[in-house]
């Protein structure tokens, strides 16, 4: 089956697609920060949807409020990880901006892999979260160490955490690129009539 969404400009077609993707991963394909998902002048927002997967019905809900942690519920039961949503609702989002994967820098390609792997592998999503958390702690330590030199004694702990979670991230990204090369290579050969070979390196 195919559903086609039509409407005038600024009626919310893209917002609807963004909402579906957000309910599948708790990651927005457009917004850089969750606060951008809340309407201007408002302090909170929520989104919910019914989904049918694994021969049963699911109710997916996410609530955001300024200054508070988001709430994710599956069938009214709170869950901690956004990756739990992808076990129920999988989504692939494609838009014209995806062409920037080729034209933009490495950051755009890393985000592409992060968005895909966070849906495919819960362990990757956890490692990515752990890495960012350790990085933020380390940044604060370095920033405040001039006033509190003893903070530098805690750096090795966060270096270790970043190394451990970073190793998991690198492992999954490398495997992802191997599979991407395999499947994208087949599609590229068909598009080029067998005259070109696509290469993917990480």
Predicted segments with their positions:
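Pre-Walker A-like glycine/lysine-rich segment at the N-terminus of P-loop NTPase domains
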Residues: 1-22
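An accessory alpha-helical subdomain
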Residues: 100-194, 198-201
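Short, conserved catalytic or interaction motifs in soluble domains
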Residues: 7, 25, 193
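Short hydrophobic/aromatic segments of transmembrane alpha-helices and their interfaces
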Residues: 19-20, 90-93, 159
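Regular, well-ordered alpha-helical segments
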Residues: 22-25, 140
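Nucleotide-state sensing region of NTPase/ATPase domains
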Residues: 24-108, 114-124, 181-186
């Amino acid at each position: 089956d195919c559903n086609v969404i039509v409407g005038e400009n600024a009626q919310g077609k893209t917002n609807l697609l963004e909402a579906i993707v957000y309910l599948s991963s708790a990651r927005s394909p457009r917004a850089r920060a969750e606060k951008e998902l809340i309407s201007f002048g408002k302090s909170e927002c929520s989104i919910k949807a019914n989904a049918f997967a694994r021969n049963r019905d699911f109710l997916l809900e996410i609530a955001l409020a300024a200054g508070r942690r988001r709430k994710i519920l599956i069938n009214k039961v709170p869950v901690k990880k956004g990756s739990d949503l992808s076990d129920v609702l999988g989504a692939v989002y494609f838009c014209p901006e995806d062409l920037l994967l080729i034209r933009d820098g490495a950051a755009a390609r890393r985000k592409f892999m992060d968005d895909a792997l966070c849906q495919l592998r819960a362990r990757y999503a956890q490692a990515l979260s752990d890495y960012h958390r350790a990085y933020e702690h380390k940044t604060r330590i370095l920033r405040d160490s001039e006033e509190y030199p003893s903070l530098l004694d805690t750096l090795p702990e966060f270096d270790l955490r970043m190394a451990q979670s970073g190793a998991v991230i690198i492992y999954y990204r490398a495997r992802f690129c191997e599979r991407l090369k395999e499947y994208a290579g087949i599609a590229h050969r068909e598009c080029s009539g067998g005259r070109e070979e696509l290469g993917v390196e990480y």
